[in-house]
Amino acid sequence: MKFVLVAVLAYLIGCINNAYIFTKYTRNIDIRNYGSGNAGATNVLRVLGPKAAAPVFVLDVLKGVVAVLLGKYFIGMPGALIAGIAVVCGHNWPIFLKFRGGKGVATSVGVVMTINPLLGLIALAIGVAVIAITRYVSLGSMTGAITFALLNIFFPNSVQVLTFAIVLALLVIFQHRSNIKRLINGTESKIGQRAQIK
């Protein structure tokens, strides 16, 4: 029963969509109607710029941190892992926004940095490096998620943590499936390219 409660609580925390809330109350727009249509920090960056995206990113990271800490408090590491997946699912598919949320990257950063700070930091550094080199946020995001999963293979903690890392990476990749198509076609937007607000 505790596992279910932790999962539901973490999911609801994830459903607090900071991109939607921030842009709705500061610009009176639904961020999902602009740019990529994604309710996440990257799309806020693309549409409104870094000053608007920064608080959204930080708050999304904190969602992951809070959910994992709550899960760990109630059930230990198994609870942390369940909460980590659930909070990302809440961010991606928020019930309050008709299941149209973000892609879970910033929230995943908070999750992995709380579960395994060292491996999380390495994965984050590699992801950021890919973004800096290629200018593709999507490619860096997927690279970071895959790196975290691979690191858990080479530096195993437990089967549960490895399974968690693989599931998390699959969630990130799944949410970027349209980006993958655009990357292949050469039409993916690079960081710094701004979308127009009509």
Swiss-Prot record:
Subcellular location: Cell membrane
Pfam families, per database record: G3P_acyltransf
Highest taxon above the source species: Bacteria
GO biological process: phospholipid biosynthetic process
Transmembrane segments: 3-23, 65-85, 111-131, 153-173
Record keyword Phosphoprotein present: no
Gene Ontology CC terms, in alphabetical order: plasma membrane
Alphabetized UniProt keyword annotations: Cell membrane, Lipid biosynthesis, Lipid metabolism, Membrane, Phospholipid biosynthesis, Phospholipid metabolism, Transferase, Transmembrane, Transmembrane helix
Pathway: Lipid metabolism; phospholipid metabolism
EC number of this enzyme: 2.3.1.275
Family, per entry: Belongs to the PlsY family.
Function as written in the Swiss-Prot or TrEMBL entry: Catalyzes the transfer of an acyl group from acyl-phosphate (acyl-PO(4)) to glycerol-3-phosphate (G3P) to form lysophosphatidic acid (LPA). This enzyme utilizes acyl-phosphate as fatty acyl donor, but not acyl-CoA or acyl-ACP.
Protein name: Glycerol-3-phosphate acyltransferase
Provenance organism: Caldanaerobacter subterraneus subsp. tengcongensis (strain DSM 15242 / JCM 11007 / NBRC 100824 / MB4)
Organism phylogeny: Bacteria, Bacillati, Bacillota, Clostridia, Thermoanaerobacterales
